[in-house]
Each structure stands twice: as C-alpha cells, then as structure tokens.
C-alpha cells in the first residue's frame, strides 16, 4: 500500500476536543475521544480481521508540530513508525507514531521493530504508560484523497509516557472506517 495520507500538511490546527466537539458526529466523537485502545475497538469491528501494514519503521527527523508537542527542538531526531490499520482489506486508520527515549536506546528501538504487531497492544498492555489529553484535528481538503469522500478526515493525537520514554501517537480516521459503520 502506498501512503496517501500524512501529518505534514501546512496549517494543521490541533486543538483540545472541546473546541471541535460541535463539528463531530456522535459516531466520530465516540471514536475520536475514546481513551481506550483503538486496536481493541478495531478488532471488534473487524471480527478480529484487523491487519497492521507497516509503511515505515526507522529513525528520522520529527515534524515541527511533533517536536513542539514533545517539547523538543526543531530538527530533533526520533523513531518514526507509520502503519495502516486495515479491516476487511481496506485501510481504516493511518497512524504515525514518534518514539523518543532519553533512557534506554534499546527499549525505544524495540518499538521500531514491531512489524505487523499493533503498537496499541504494548501501550495498553500492562498499564505502565500514562496517556495525555487527546487533541483532534479536522482536515479541510488537506489531502486529495479526502476531497473525493463524503466523510471528513479527522485525526487525533496524544502522548504516552513511561519513565523516560515518550510516544506520540497520531491516528487519522479514514473514510473507509466511517463507511464500515454507516
């Protein structure tokens, strides 16, 4: 699968959910603001036919808005993981995670070698990660792919912290997910 979506669109406005709540449908609000494991919800929706398709797992430059939310300087380097979460053969979510660890390099590197294993299983597995507030973003024709859909592109992000490790998880909810639930 090729990457059609990305989080580097100019002018993205990440906001606390209260600022955009009135623009969300009941269904999108339920999914975007849920603090539980998205992986678990997608497994239920897909009758356990959820596939993780890795697109990128490497060390790279962190985008400016990512560095800002993580409290890092522009041009900072971190682990970058991009995947599609696919249900019934259709991409439902595009996820980009940024992993920074000022402690053990090995621990951070392990998260870049997950392959088709969901990151959510680790983040929610043992309860050791603390999750920040969820921020949301609505794309306004930011991607050509979204312009062809009747469903707006919504994304959310939050930071998971455990000791010296910080994992910024950004999830874009794709039109195929909303179509599956309609």
UniProtKB/Swiss-Prot annotation:
Gene Ontology BP terms: pyruvate biosynthetic process; ubiquinone biosynthetic process
Cited Gene3D superfamilies: Chorismate lyase-like
GO cellular component: cytosol
Enzyme class, broadest EC rank: lyase
Binding site for substrate: 81, 119, 171
Cellular location(s): Cytoplasm
Lineage: superkingdom: Bacteria
Pathway membership, UniProt: Cofactor biosynthesis; ubiquinone biosynthesis
Catalysed reaction, written as an equation: chorismate = 4-hydroxybenzoate + pyruvate
EC number(s) given by UniProt: 4.1.3.40
InterPro entries from the UniProt entry: Chorismate--pyruvate_lyase, Chorismate_lyase_/UTRA_dom_sf
Recorded GO MF terms: chorismate lyase activity
Record keywords, A-Z: Cytoplasm, Lyase, Pyruvate, Ubiquinone biosynthesis
Family: Belongs to the UbiC family.
PANTHER family for the chain: CHORISMATE PYRUVATE-LYASE
Cited HAMAP family: UbiC
Purpose: Removes the pyruvyl group from chorismate, with concomitant aromatization of the ring, to provide 4-hydroxybenzoate (4HB) for the ubiquinone pathway.
Name recorded for this polypeptide: Probable chorismate pyruvate-lyase
Lineage, highest ranks first: Bacteria, Pseudomonadati, Pseudomonadota, Gammaproteobacteria, Pseudomonadales
């Amino acid at each position: 699968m090729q990457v059609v979506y990305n989080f580097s669109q100019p002018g993205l406005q990440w906001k606390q959910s209260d600022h955009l709540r009135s623009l969300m449908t009941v269904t999108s609000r339920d999914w975007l603001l849920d603090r539980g494991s998205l992986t678990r919800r997608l497994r239920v929706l897909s009758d356990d036919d959820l596939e993780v398709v890795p697109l990128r797992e490497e060390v790279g430059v962190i985008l400016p808005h990512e560095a800002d939310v993580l409290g890092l300087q522009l041009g900072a380097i971190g682990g970058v993981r991009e995947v599609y979460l696919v249900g019934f053969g259709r991409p439902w979510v595009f996820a980009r995670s940024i992993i920074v660890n000022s402690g053990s390099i090995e621990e951070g590197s392990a998260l870049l070698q997950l392959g088709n294993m969901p990151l959510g299983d680790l983040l929610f597995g043992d309860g050791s990660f603390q999750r920040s507030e969820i921020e949301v973003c609505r794309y306004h024709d930011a991607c050509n792919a979204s312009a062809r859909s009747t469903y707006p592109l919504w994304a959310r992000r939050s930071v998971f912290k455990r000791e010296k490790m910080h994992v910024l998880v950004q999830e874009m909810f794709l039109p195929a997910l909303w179509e599956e639930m309609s």
